Amino acid sequence: MALMSNKTAIESILGNFEKKHVDAIYNAAAQTILSHSEFRNKHFAYSLNSYQKKIASKVGIELYPNGYLPHSHPLSKIFENHLLFDVLPGVVNTSRLVMCSIKESKVLVFKGIRDKSRRQVSDLNALNSLNNSHTSFINRLVASKDVSRYTEEADAFFQSKKGSPELFSRNFIKSLENKEAVFFHDEVHHWTKAQMFSFLKSTKVKRFIFTVVYPPEILKKFANSQNPKVYDFKVDKGRLFFFPDGVKTEAYEQKLNMEWLFSASHLRSGDCVWTVTRHKSIYAHHLFEISIGELVTDSKLFFSDYNSIDMSKIFLDRFRSYEVFPISIEHLYKVYSYLLCLKKPDLESGLAKLRQIIGDDVEIKEFLFFEQFCKRLIERQTSWGLFGHSFFEKLTDMALSSLPNSIARIFPQWKKKNTFEFLFSLGTLVVDVERKVCFEHVLEEWGFEVVITDENAYLDPLSIFAINENFNEDRVDDGYLERIRLPFWNLNDYDLKRKRVNAYNILSYRFEEERKIESAQKGPNKMLQIEWYGIKEFKVDPFISNSITEFTLLEALLGKRIDPKKYSYSKQACTLSNYLTFLCAEGLDGFNLEEHLERRLKAAGHDVSDDEEEELTSAEQAGPIKILADPLGFMKECLEEIPIETEPSLEERGQFSTDYHSEKFEINYNDIFNPHNCMNTHGDEIPTPSDGNCFFSAFTETFEVERPDTLRSDFSDWLMEFNGGSYASLAEMIRPNGVFMEAELIYLFCVFRGVTLIIHDRTHEKENVYAVHRGFEEGHMVHRGNHFVGIETYNISTLTSDPLLGDIPCGFSEEITKFHFRPDHFNCAQFRGRKAAFITKVDADYGHNGMVYPHNSWVPSLEEIIQICGQGDDFNCALINFYEANSSLGFHRDNERVYNDDPILTVCTFGEGRFTIEFKDQVTSFLMTAGSFFLMPKGFQKKARHSVSNEMSRVSITFRKHVRRLNGSPIAIREENYKNTCLINAFSKAMKRSKQAIIAKLKTVNSPFWSRYLSEGNGGSIEDCQSACEALDVTVDLNVNGKCVVLGKGALRISMALRNNHFSVINAAQLMERTFVSHLLEKGNVNVLEGFDAMLSGDVGAAGVNKIQFAANFEFARILANSFLNMTTGICLGKALDNGEKYFLHILKDRVKQIGIDVTMVCGFAGSGKSRKLQSWLHSRKKGNFCVVSPRTNLAADWAFKLELEPNEQRKVSTFEKFIKTDKSKLDLIVIDELTLFPNGYLDLLVYELADVNRHCQIILLFDPLQARYHNKMDESILTFEHDVDRLIGGQNIEYIYSTHRMSRYFNRFFDVPCFNQADRTEEQRLWIFDDVYSIPSICSDRQEPCDVLLVESDLEKKAFSPIINVMTFGESQGLTFNHVCILLSESSAASNEFRWMVALTRARTRFSLCSTFLGGIEEFKVKRKESLITSILQGEKITFNRLNLMLKCNLIRREKENGCRDEVDREERLEGDPFLKPFIFLGQRVEKDEDEVEEVKIREPTCQTHLYITEPNFGLCYNFDFIREKEQREYREDMLVTNQFCDSYDKVHINGKRETPGPLRFKAIYPKHSADDDMTFWMAVRKRLVFREEEENYQRLSRAHLVGGLLYTNFKKKMGLEFTFDQGLLEESINAFEKKKLEKSCGTIKSHSIRSDIDWALNDVFLFMKSQLCTKYEKQFVDAKAGQTLACFQHLILVQFAPWCRYLETQIRNQLPEEIYIHSNKNFDDLNAWVKKFFQRDICVESDYEAFDASQDEYILSFEIHLMKDAHFPQKIIDAYIDLKCKLGCKLGHFSIMRFTGEFCTFLFNTLANMAFTMCRYEWRRGQPIAFAGDDMCALNNLAVCHDFDDLFELISLKAKVERTETPMFCGWRLTPYGIVKEPELVYNRFQVAIEEGKVLECLENYAIEVSYAYSLSERLYEVLKSERQVQYHQAVVRFIVTHIDKLKTKVRDLFLEQSSDEDI
């Protein structure tokens, strides 16, 4: 986080350059600024406030630094100068410029700028020619102020005719006539539109450039300024009064209506057209240009120089403008977000926040608005949101929207909805103006009614929302202002009725004009002046369509593309009538109207014969009259005459685009060979003969041509007549057969045919695609060298009018064919006619119809294909299909649950196939060839199905985005969202590697396992820790419940603990018994059994592991074998069809009746992780000989996915039938998963086979004995013997894992099993019970928890409810996992056994619900079930472990797994009162460090008694009488201010206080007291302790100080012997220590300081105040008034950012300091006492004190700190932020110089370091010489010699030391002696007396007793220290006082004073 500023890469590296290089870099900038300074000083040096500076800089104006020129409206003046002198010279590129309405002085400045700029880019000859610049100026008198502005020459152009409508005199027009460029300054806003046209037509200037002043918000009907600090205005009766900078006395009056100018893209008068260009807009100042000709210009203008909310969202009354005070959007967002952050928001907090934001810019209207806004927000909140509505809420919303607001506002839902819509639709004000052609002959009026808002708009803003239609723009106001029956008046209006009337008025006006024309034949051509730009606004309104001449509208729509000789007016009118009737009948909107009309006209029209010419003429003459007389009848007549479906002839198609208008045709070279992005799919090239006619042959293959043999001659004939025969020469040239077609001829041919030709140029290796002409039909051909060939082209055409399927993105790229994929590259699934490989780069799986695809890792080439297609890069999975020839895939939808309705990309890399799409009842197909692709967009799968058929082999890739796994669990969880990763965190800290690096390594070893581990967020077990050890190659000593388990086998050994479900790192394992887990097996070893038993039996895997001897029964095996052969069990081992007998040869012969075998069982609760450790073990031993046998295909696929088996290793996972067929002779291990689902006798059958082929194979059985046993209707009467599981566990004690990773805490209300799933569920969430199955999907969906499956007991129920919801039987669901299941309570389930119910109750992760269809209801169901699991749940009883144990014939021994999944939330709770600090404190799991306590041996020194003399009573008062002076003499006075530091009375009464002395002689009067209300003391502190300087000077001084700072640090580092290496662990500990320290405060304290966390508190702004204190230092006794101590309060973010780094630095330095260097902190007096005893040398000591120590820590000390930080490996961004903070720091008093502040982060550390650096330079210090440091205090216990090596340095730095050499040194208020430290007894005595006066003895007794104890413990040796009688007196008095209050002491110091006998005892 950048604290003060963000730096670019170059700015960041500048700090590493040498000073000369930095100076050289900045020298260029200095020269540039110098070159600009003279000009900027004259025109941009006006004095601006900070806001105005910000505004000017934001719009890109270069200001003169520190402007000083006063001006009445400086900002507007700067805007004007910027347009004139910065922008205008770049716009005018001609020297022939005439400037008008501008002072001569400004013209001269403008000419100077232009001459200077041209001089820089011209040579000498050009320079000479510039001397003849033709820039001139002409002024005329228009306004009264012009008389004083311009010279008397302007009078010559004054229009003196009274009442003349012309604004310009003849002389003036003549002087500007035919000029190349004319510029008007700030005059055009006085003109009308008519005057603008008059000027343009009269002068005929080529370029008319002008500035205008006009507030853009008027265009959006705002009647007052939305930038009141920049400008203001007032609207009054069609006049606009503009106030620059809001200054009313400088007002300008001008015309209100300038809408015609801003909304005009072109000006048109007859055949003359001008283009309007807006060059620049700066708030209300604009620069426009009008140039001759019809050029491309902006279709819209945008004005966004606003920071207020768009109040038009509120005031939606039609046809009115409102006076609205601008409400800052920034203020609104900040107040709104602040209130949301508060747990208990209140009105006062919101308004206080607003007051803090706006500072001194208080506006009462804004306060009134926010007062009501905050009230409404607090009272009603904004519960109405975007998502999560129930069906009922949606209905309520629709009803409220349709009600009048007067009724709707009664409902509380409306008010919440209203607030939400206001906030949701809120945006910054942007004025956008739609531009169109402005006609001269169309008169304009602009409706503008101002509605002055009253106080209600601010007292109750929501009532204004109510009046203004609740933002529902579909509702129409019935009232509107008087219509102005003139065209182009507000054509696009809110009101539909008014819009129709306006449109009708325009048409009526045009028809009246048409009737005046004498020649009716010219009528339609004349009507072309209407043009499409006006007609298109009518939107084909039926109101208009019945009132307009149809063929006239058609011509206006299609422009000049209609050939009147080809299409009769009757046909045109009929075509239009038919289509308009169709539009009205269907209720369509007329989208792409002109294209549809062209297509229909093309179908209806035909060549005009000689006989028809008469009809044509008569129609031309009578048509308009007839149609106007009876338009509907004429339409009907035309409709009967000509069928609209008539297909056009060849000639009609070929000549459709012929232009017969008077305008001359010119070849548009911009329309020839334009680069084109072809999105069609192409097949093979179509060869053409190389006979010179290849173009025509290819054209014939591309387009349907009826007479291809005459194509060349028809084209030649057309050229002869086209454009008046101007292309006759080309016609003769192209007529001969074999003449090659070239560029212009190809273009003309496309014009002739009216087509668009797409040419694929494949002459070179890279294909280029070009488009020629824009016609009605598109075709493709290939150009290779000088030869044209055809090409097969396929386009996914529009299926229906449905917009979803209208245009499916598709394309083709040759690069795709370069990618080659083969089935043997991947682990494929086999289907009929195809193989498919599923590839993913996330933890995803995929399957359908009961099968699961094998897993393949992502390959980089797929990313390249995605990039080539360019259809998005959000795909994370791909399915590669390898189709065989003549294969197909039927109609289907890609709508599996693993993904949402996201786009799906299909790419064909090899071969070709036909893709068919079925939508509703329509079917369309297209061919996909190699290199083609298309995208099925979002929503496609819901509306359409698709199929594929292939005649030849083909490779297709389908890219998708998977969001969840097949079981419903989410995937693609972002790393920062991982939960319960204390195991990962522990490895990260122990190995000193980042968490990301640990995760990356784990995923490379076993991606499925660790991806699922992180996604589920259920924490880690001991087995997971072991897997991590093997993956990371480390050895972990894991401390678990007092035992130490050794995991892994690696060179690196670390110690961890698992306590309270939390993994943490410990320094070293304690001495305890260790259990070693075998690591005999290296990764990759083929012997899968080596170390396996040790893994199972060790402490890591012991939970749930049982060793049991199983007695296999031959009879049971034989029965099952016969059942397989008879196909009553299984389907693929039949005797007849499958030759199954060969697999049971070992059973057919006689065998012993029983065989005993030792098996290993792992038993555990559902989701307990029974298979997890085995999967981890086998994953690293995939080369071993093992096989996992699963009862179902989907379970087997899950094993294969987690083991990441290669294609040739798939045999290692098998279903139970396939496993019977496999060879078992080489297997070392067989894992049977979910044994309860295997048929009875399967284990017997397997044991007898192994007895023959492999006696050494080990069998592992995984099952939950509480789950249902195998059941099959076909063999239930055959396999009647007891199931293998029950025979195994019968009468045994079974270790059972009683915990679950599957189920959430929701299930703890039903079971007492520990649930490790961290889903957001609680036990309190109620059980849902539904009354019928039909309501389950809708209710669950509304509750945001859709039901995944309905579990039923019988197949009959499954069939009945399958159409409604996904249904499974209890048995089918066994082994599967869902998020939410619903269990059906019915007659069938009431008869089900407890094991099957256990299956149903344990299938869900987050919730199960119930649905009752039982006849009689829930109560009868409970009676039927009696005592059962489901009955307990219905009665609210928790199912206990003991209750489950009773279900079995064995004894389950409960074992719970330790799991690390504890997250801490106490930090968040502690920060509840400071929401702004919360984001900056780590709220996750803390690093818990256990440190071994080392008990130190304490040496007890001998104590001896001493005699203390009894002092005289009140002896202290005698001394005070001599030393205390009058208060008047001690206080400081300046002018009328005087300090108040010394008390001389008992003016303040203290509880329990005593008055033992007169007021002037009070002990409190000994010391100066600083109070916050003492202004003079504060100003003394400011003068003494603070230095102010501008930040620029601070930076300059710092840049010059680095040499001295470097010397200081180099010397310091050398003498201290410091060497730094970065320690990440120490940094994390420092961060944690800081946060813990911060949060040790109470919640109340944190909340009371929350204002310091306010995000709006500027980081470089401190709150400065004076510390209130009684200065009870020994040296402050009896002194005069002293300056106060200033404190600086910093923003909390500063502390959060820097404090941990300072802790880190302090620890690093302390660890390296020699023991003779002591830093005293944290009031640890024992350490100081021990250090003094050890190093005191009875020598002369050196003490140093500093003058203004804080203020003296200037840029040199800062440079020293920077060098230290860099050497300590601080990040550069931290150093840069620290520099910025020190240089930019300020408060309300101004900017500070670089200095230290009390209250700054780590003030003590940096003070101490500065003190040490100074001392090391000042004195000749050698190793072994003891020195104590503490902030600005220093005491050396040797007589150090002064060093003169740095004398020059000391002349530069501000630090000045006061040195004292003494034999009785003082340090931090302690006297240092050979026997330790002693506190000055006089100081303690006086403090006690002050406490007695104020009644605070008990508050300080303990601390003072501790201070005195050091002297008291010296006994008789004290007399060597206290050498004066006065000191002994004070000491005796203090000790006696403590002894008399000894019963009040609580700490161990009490024992010291009790050991001594009193005088009375002797």
Swiss-Prot record:
The active site is at 982, 1062. Its EC number is 2.1.1.-, 1.14.11.-, 3.4.22.-, 2.7.7.48. Residues 64-261 form the Alphavirus-like MT domain. GO terms for molecular function: ATP binding; ATP hydrolysis activity; cysteine-type peptidase activity; dioxygenase activity; metal ion binding; mRNA methyltransferase activity; RNA binding; RNA helicase activity. Binds 1 Fe(2+) ion per subunit. GO terms for biological process: DNA-templated transcription; mRNA modification; proteolysis; RNA processing; viral RNA genome replication. Specific enzymatic cleavages by the viral protease yield mature proteins. Residues 978-1067 form the Peptidase C23 domain. Residues 683-794 form the OTU domain. Coiled coil: none annotated. Keywords: ATP-binding, Dioxygenase, Helicase, Hydrolase, Iron, Metal-binding, Multifunctional enzyme, Nucleotide-binding, Nucleotidyltransferase, Oxidoreductase, Protease, RNA-directed RNA polymerase, Thiol protease, Transferase, Viral RNA replication. Residues 874-963 form the Fe2OG dioxygenase domain. Residues 1298-1445 form the (+)RNA virus helicase C-terminal domain. Residues 1122-1297 form the (+)RNA virus helicase ATP-binding domain. 2-oxoglutarate binds at residue 954. CDD domains: Betaflexiviridae_RdRp (cd23245). ATP binds at residues 1164-1171. Residues 1739-1846 form the RdRp catalytic domain. This is RNA replication polyprotein. It comes from Citrus leaf blotch virus (isolate Nagami kumquat/France/SRA-153/1984).
